[in-house]
């Protein structure tokens, strides 16, 4: 059986924590920020944890 490979696009966007949760950075922060409120930009800096239904999908494509 061939070796399982990680989905490289997902590997760059999602990180698995030690407890098995999946973290990611939210979108809408990289450019065109001048019209956005400071509170919104500050909130977009934080890592977010995916919901359980999405975590299952991400774990399947990130076996390592």
UniProtKB/Swiss-Prot annotation:
Keyword Ribosomal protein recorded: yes
Superkingdom of this protein's organism: Bacteria
GO biological process: translation
InterPro entries in UniProt: Ribosomal_bL35, Ribosomal_bL35-like, Ribosomal_bL35_CS, Ribosomal_bL35_sf
Entry's Gene Ontology cellular component terms: cytosolic large ribosomal subunit
Coiled-coil residue spans: none
This protein's record includes keyword Transmembrane helix: no
Entry-linked Gene3D superfamilies: 4.10.410.60
Pfam families attached to this UniProt entry: Ribosomal_L35p
GO molecular function: structural constituent of ribosome
Annotated stretches, region: Disordered: 18-39
Keywords: Ribonucleoprotein, Ribosomal protein
Comp. bias (Basic residues): 26-39
Similarity comment: family membership: Belongs to the bacterial ribosomal protein bL35 family.
Protein name: Large ribosomal subunit protein bL35
Organism whose genome encodes this protein: Symbiobacterium thermophilum (strain DSM 24528 / JCM 14929 / IAM 14863 / T)
